[in-house]
């Protein structure tokens, strides 16, 4: 009777080979490397039920004889170190891949991603080494306390907005759309004025984020709030105000508590997932709502000549502010594409790192 072979999944880094053998409740394991050939034998429950399984793999290039393995209820994980830290084009010396062997997509990285992972590890080691040599900031506790309180105040403010608007929507229905500004504006003004701190904090080194992304977001929102809604009474009774405010507050009631917990070195996995996921539908919807507000304001600015720039008296004309708004619309959707791509990469990097740690 021919020997039974289990399903084996593999992945690599520059210095290591990872094998995942699909045998549950494995016993009597015999795993070793001789003359660059990995020999595996073990009893357990695999693709052919409860049996003894075995396989051998002749590696493409030399590996170290020491083999690390860990058996769990579901599988056997094997780690083999390469003699040289180089990237392999394939796992085995023979070009034709064994039928039982397949890529482990849970751990799979292409060469460029693996190089990026190496750089991240080196940067982390260098950072830890540097921080161990540098005297700790005596004001670190004060800074964290300030940031915690800032995020707490913003969370409470946006939570009040979100709850107030939700309750009014259930009680009044669509009628709540038309007086949102007069009911919510004071708290929204407060939160958005306070949000200027999100530009100041990175500028003075309180947080390690870019100044420009924060500036674009804060100034973009304040432009909609103070110029489009605040300066035009005709805009304040439009339903679009409800949708803009509701989308803003929905995003922030997840973002600010995430930052609050980060200030005290705490993580709530569900909140982290929401922080890096909920923006995917809400951010484009928010930009769309802001664009609708800008479009609806253009004829009002044309009619009232508000904020128009007067030209020389000889012409008797003025440059309408609506031209600036039309240009702003183009910039807004360009910013949507750039920011969406940036946020998606940030999300991918965040969860890929967490997945590696879990493995």
UniProtKB/Swiss-Prot annotation:
<dbReference type="InterPro" id="IPR007482">
    <property type="entry name" value="Tyr_Pase-like_PTPLA"/>
</dbReference>
<feature type="transmembrane region" description="Helical">
    <location>
        <begin position="210"/>
        <end position="230"/>
    </location>
</feature>
<dbReference type="Pfam" id="PF04387">
    <property type="entry name" value="PTPLA"/>
</dbReference>
<feature type="transmembrane region" description="Helical">
    <location>
        <begin position="318"/>
        <end position="338"/>
    </location>
</feature>
<keyword id="KW-1133">Transmembrane helix</keyword>
<feature type="transmembrane region" description="Helical">
    <location>
        <begin position="145"/>
        <end position="165"/>
    </location>
</feature>
<feature type="transmembrane region" description="Helical">
    <location>
        <begin position="240"/>
        <end position="260"/>
    </location>
</feature>
<comment type="pathway">
    <text>Lipid metabolism; fatty acid biosynthesis.</text>
</comment>
<dbReference type="InterPro" id="IPR007052">
    <property type="entry name" value="CS_dom"/>
</dbReference>
<dbReference type="GO" id="GO:0005783">
    <property type="term" value="C:endoplasmic reticulum"/>
</dbReference>
<keyword id="KW-0275">Fatty acid biosynthesis</keyword>
<keyword id="KW-0472">Membrane</keyword>
<feature type="topological domain" description="Lumenal">
    <location>
        <begin position="166"/>
        <end position="186"/>
    </location>
</feature>
<feature type="topological domain" description="Lumenal">
    <location>
        <begin position="231"/>
        <end position="239"/>
    </location>
</feature>
<keyword id="KW-0812">Transmembrane</keyword>
<comment type="function">
    <text>Catalyzes the third of the four reactions of the long-chain fatty acids elongation cycle. This endoplasmic reticulum-bound enzymatic process, allows the addition of two carbons to the chain of long- and very long-chain fatty acids/VLCFAs per cycle. This enzyme catalyzes the dehydration of the 3-hydroxyacyl-CoA intermediate into trans-2,3-enoyl-CoA, within each cycle of fatty acid elongation. Thereby, it participates in the production of VLCFAs of different chain lengths that are involved in multiple biological processes as precursors of membrane lipids and lipid mediators.</text>
</comment>
<keyword id="KW-0256">Endoplasmic reticulum</keyword>
<feature type="topological domain" description="Cytoplasmic">
    <location>
        <begin position="261"/>
        <end position="277"/>
    </location>
</feature>
<dbReference type="InterPro" id="IPR008978">
    <property type="entry name" value="HSP20-like_chaperone"/>
</dbReference>
<keyword id="KW-0456">Lyase</keyword>
<comment type="similarity">
    <text>Belongs to the very long-chain fatty acids dehydratase HACD family.</text>
</comment>
<dbReference type="GO" id="GO:0030148">
    <property type="term" value="P:sphingolipid biosynthetic process"/>
</dbReference>
<dbReference type="GO" id="GO:0005789">
    <property type="term" value="C:endoplasmic reticulum membrane"/>
</dbReference>
<feature type="domain" description="CS">
    <location>
        <begin position="3"/>
        <end position="92"/>
    </location>
</feature>
<feature type="coiled-coil region">
    <location>
        <begin position="109"/>
        <end position="133"/>
    </location>
</feature>
<feature type="topological domain" description="Cytoplasmic">
    <location>
        <begin position="208"/>
        <end position="209"/>
    </location>
</feature>
<feature type="active site">
    <location>
        <position position="290"/>
    </location>
</feature>
<feature type="transmembrane region" description="Helical">
    <location>
        <begin position="187"/>
        <end position="207"/>
    </location>
</feature>
<dbReference type="GO" id="GO:0030497">
    <property type="term" value="P:fatty acid elongation"/>
</dbReference>
<dbReference type="GO" id="GO:0018812">
    <property type="term" value="F:3-hydroxyacyl-CoA dehydratase activity"/>
</dbReference>
<feature type="topological domain" description="Lumenal">
    <location>
        <begin position="299"/>
        <end position="317"/>
    </location>
</feature>
<dbReference type="GO" id="GO:0042761">
    <property type="term" value="P:very long-chain fatty acid biosynthetic process"/>
</dbReference>
<feature type="topological domain" description="Cytoplasmic">
    <location>
        <begin position="339"/>
        <end position="359"/>
    </location>
</feature>
<keyword id="KW-0276">Fatty acid metabolism</keyword>
<keyword id="KW-0175">Coiled coil</keyword>
<feature type="active site">
    <location>
        <position position="283"/>
    </location>
</feature>
<feature type="transmembrane region" description="Helical">
    <location>
        <begin position="278"/>
        <end position="298"/>
    </location>
</feature>
<keyword id="KW-0443">Lipid metabolism</keyword>
<keyword id="KW-0444">Lipid biosynthesis</keyword>
<protein>
    <recommendedName>
        <fullName>Very-long-chain (3R)-3-hydroxyacyl-CoA dehydratase</fullName>
        <ecNumber>4.2.1.134</ecNumber>
    </recommendedName>
</protein>
<dbReference type="GO" id="GO:0102158">
    <property type="term" value="F:very-long-chain (3R)-3-hydroxyacyl-CoA dehydratase activity"/>
</dbReference>
<feature type="topological domain" description="Cytoplasmic">
    <location>
        <begin position="1"/>
        <end position="144"/>
    </location>
</feature>
């Amino acid at each position: 009777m021919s020997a039974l072979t289990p399903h084996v999944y593999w992945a690599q880094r520059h210095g290591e080979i990872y094998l995942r053998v699909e045998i549950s409740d494995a016993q009597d394991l015999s795993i070793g490397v001789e003359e660059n050939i990995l020999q595996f034998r073990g009893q357990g429950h695999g693709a052919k039920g409860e049996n003894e399984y075995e396989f051998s793999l002749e590696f493409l290039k030399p590996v170290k004889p020491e083999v690390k393995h860990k058996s769990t209820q579901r599988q056997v994980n094997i780690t083999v170190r390469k003699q040289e830290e180089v990237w392999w084009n394939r796992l085995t010396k023979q070009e034709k891949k064994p039928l039982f062997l397949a890529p482990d997509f849970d751990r799979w990285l292409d060469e460029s991603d693996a190089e990026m992972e190496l750089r991240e590890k080196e940067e982390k080691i260098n950072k830890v080494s540097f921080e161990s040599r540098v005297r700790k900031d005596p004001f670190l506790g004060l800074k964290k306390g300030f940031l915690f309180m800032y995020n707490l105040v913003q969370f409470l403010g946006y939570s009040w907005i979100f709850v107030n608007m939700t309750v009014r929507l259930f009680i009044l229905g669509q009628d709540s759309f038309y007086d949102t500004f007069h009911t919510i504006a004071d708290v929204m003004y407060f939160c958005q004025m306070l949000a200027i701190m999100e530009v100041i904090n990175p500028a003075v080194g309180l947080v390690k984020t870019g100044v420009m992304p924060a500036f674009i977001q804060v100034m973009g929102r304040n432009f909609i709030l103070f110029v489009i809604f605040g300066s035009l009474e005709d805009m304040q009774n439009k339903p679009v105000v409800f949708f803009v405010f509701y989308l803003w507050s929905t995003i922030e009631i997840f973002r600010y508590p995430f930052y609050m917990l980060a200030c005290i070195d705490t993580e709530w996995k569900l909140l982290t997932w929401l922080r890096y996921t909920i923006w995917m539908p809400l951010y484009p919807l928010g930009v769309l709502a802001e664009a609708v507000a800008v479009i609806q304001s253009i004829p009002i600015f044309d009619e009232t000549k508000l904020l128009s720039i007067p030209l020389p008296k000889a012409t008797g004309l003025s440059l309408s502010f609506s031209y600036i708004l039309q240009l702003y619309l183009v910039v807004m959707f360009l910013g949507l594409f750039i920011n969406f791509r940036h946020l998606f990469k940030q999300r991918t990097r965040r969860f890929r790192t967490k997945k590696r740690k879990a493995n």
